[in-house]
From Swiss-Prot:
It is an enzyme of class 7 (translocase). The gene is nuoD. NDH-1 is composed of 14 different subunits. Subunits NuoB, C, D, E, F, and G constitute the peripheral sector of the complex. Belongs to the complex I 49 kDa subunit family. Keywords: Cell inner membrane, Cell membrane, Membrane, NAD, Quinone, Translocase, Transport, Ubiquinone. The lineage of its organism: Bacteria, Pseudomonadati, Pseudomonadota, Betaproteobacteria, Burkholderiales. This is NADH-quinone oxidoreductase subunit D.
Length: 417
């Protein structure tokens, strides 16, 4: 009798549900996955090596391009590692601004995740709603840094500039009449903080909308409940972090367990799952959006009451003000030196980790006393999660592989880096 062989199937890298350039080699028995072999490296851009050839400040924009859905949180880990080596303290106002933008970025990431995950499973409406909300948050990025995605807003010693007093407004054009224009600019009359405050006042209702569409939806539950189950012990052994670990019932969040910046002064909860399946991870991330809303609200309240510097007053690290640079020779020299040679970081090594929307994002930095890193190692959460795909998908149907890739929330910028 002829030997029955497993069927081998290539999934991606052009597949719409592959979230970028994932190539999976699936070994199938009928429609059941026996083995899932991820092939990575199709988006490798040598970020770690490039950083060794650039000054410390020139590598900040590279960080935006790692996980290109959670831009500012990547920068945060990098500048924190530099600050550890320099031994400098960031002004409190800058810390609050950083925390606020970390949470804005978390919401941006989770909106992209819920939209793409729902679209993969077959619910298109959520995708459209999520992108409606993302648009406002992209405008917040643009107002503060000039770029909708790659902000390069965090700097060693603080942030690039203070929050603007006016929110940019839509201008008149041929495609909008006066009535539509005034409606679009309705919540843009005040400062950037007013705009963010208005958005996060409306946002909980938007999250309720997504939950109405998905949480008790029969098809959604059939596709997610009991799929990709990971036990708490196994999740720890596999190096899972973030929502992947919390979905398995382990309460681990760097913002609470190893607080950085001003997270220890803020009031928020850590959502934790019970069953460790795709559905629990979905519920954890949805609740994270609500908790981020709470954190942003507290930051706005503090920032309104406490004006102050947003950059350290140390011209060896931070550039002088634009006005000072144009009117004072000494400050011009400092400015020129900072942006040509850069600052020298004392010899040593440091590891800084932040609670990234996808898990623990870490930067391990070694300095030999020069103006460039000797070695930069990036600990990407998605890399560890993707390596668990084989174990999570084994014994499931092909259609469930799409759900499992979606629940891992993978972006290949950081996996391949």
């Amino acid at each position: 009798m002829a030997e029955i062989k497993n069927y081998t199937l290539n999934f991606g890298p052009q597949h719409p549900a592959a979230h970028g350039v994932l190539r999976l080699v699936l070994e199938l028995d009928g429609e059941v996955i026996q083995r899932a072999d991820p092939h990575i490296g199709l988006l490798h851009r040598a970020t770690e090596k490039l950083a060794e050839t650039k000054t410390f400040i020139q590598s900040v924009p590279y960080m935006d391009r790692l996980d290109y859905v959670s831009m500012m949180v990547n920068e945060h880990g990098y500048v924190m590692a530099i600050e550890k080596l320099l031994g400098i303290e960031v002004p409190v106002r800058a810390q609050y601004i950083r925390v606020m933008f970390d949470e804005v970025t978390r919401v941006l990431n989770h909106l992209m995740w819920i939209g793409a995950h729902a679209l993969d499973v077959g619910a298109m409406a959520v995708f459209l709603y999520a992108f409606r909300e993302r648009e406002d948050l992209m405008d917040v990025y643009e107002a503060v840094s000039g770029a909708r995605m790659h902000a390069a807003y965090y700097r060693p010693g603080g942030v690039y500039r203070d929050l603007p007093d006016a929110m940019p407004q839509y201008k008149a054009s041929k495609i909008r009449n006066a009535k539509a224009l005034s409606k679009m600019n309705e919540n843009r009359q005040g400062s950037l903080l007013d705009f963010i405050d208005d958005f996060f006042t409306r946002f909980p209702k938007c999250v309720d909308e997504y939950e109405t569409l998905l949480t008790d939806n029969r098809i959604w539950k059939q596709r997610l409940v009991g799929i990709g189950v990971v036990s708490p012990e196994r999740a720890l052994n596999l190096g899972m972090t973030g929502a992947m670990l919390r979905g398995s019932g382990i309460e681990w969040d760097l913002r609470k367990k190893q607080p950085y910046e001003v997270y220890d002064k803020l009031d928020f909860d850590i959502p934790v799952g019970v069953n460790g399946d795709c559905y629990d991870r979905y519920l954890v991330r949805v609740e994270e959006m609500r908790q981020s809303t709470r954190i942003v609200k507290q930051c706005i309240e503090w920032l309104r009451k406490n004006p102050g510097p947003v950059m350290i007053d140390n011209h060896k690290v931070a550039p002088p003000s634009r006005v000072g640079m144009k009117s004072n020779m000494e400050e011009l020299i400092h400015h020129f030196k900072l942006f040509t040679e850069g600052f020298h970081v004392p010899e040593g090594e440091a590891y800084a980790a932040v609670e990234h929307p996808k898990g623990e994002f870490g930067i391990y930095l070694i300095s030999d006393g020069a103006n460039k890193p000797y070695r930069l190692k990036i600990r990407a959460p998605g890399y560890a999660h993707l390596s668990t795909l084989d174990e999570m998908a084994r014994g499931h149907m092909i259609a469930d592989a799409v759900t499992i890739i979606g629940t891992q929330d993978i972006v290949f910028g950081e996996v391949d880096r």
